[in-house]
Amino acid sequence: MRKKIPLIAREQKRIYTGFLIIMAVMFVLTSAYTEFNPMVLIENGEAFWDFITNDFLPPALPKASRIPGIFESVAVTLALAMSSTTVAAILAFFVALFGSEKVSPFPRAAKYVRGFATFLRNIPALVWAFILFSSLGIGTGVGFVALCITSFAFMVRAFVETIEDVSQDCVESLEAVGASFPQRVAQAILPSCLCGFLSWFLYCIEVNIRASTIVGMVGGGGVGLTLFSYIKGFQYDIAFTIILLVAAM
């Protein structure tokens, strides 16, 4: 008699089924709490598509005299993303060394460093921009500081996790021969973590290009401010062209 071998163990199947049931119940409860009704989207779908096809499409170009200003705002957005990420990465690297219990000269302080970075990371760049408006005013300075804070907090946690993956044997062997803290960093941490650091750095640049657009819409400068001005002026076809330009960055 042939016996069928289940592809998923019974215990795992029960866990998955229970998880799906919990997620379904949570969806129903949260939808009821927020009064979310998918039928409203379906009923208003025709009006939505009319708005897109009549106001946004086809995309249009602004006046020739304004095109250089748009490209200049795009350059400002890219510069904000690059500069804020670069400054944040340099600061995050040094702070992450103290946030890793494996290499930190003050292991007890590592959890406080990670906790502080987590606190900063949980506050979105848009919120930081609103907080900084009162002291710095509207401009690219606000966008730079807001992006720098969120990027710094994100990369501190990312760099700490990357450092934690370094082999403990490598660090201990350098300690055994009397290597100082800077020597351990230069000989063990950097060679082992450089690729990981670069990956997180490039990822953060990509995220900040999008974030700088959002921050710019509330006064942080760059292409976001230009986009918001066209939306506010009900020039949706030109705004859609700028949206496509942002998507291409």
Q: What is each of the regions a protein language model found here?
A:
Residues 139-189, 195-204:
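Membrane-cytosol interface at the C-terminal ends of specific transmembrane alpha-helices
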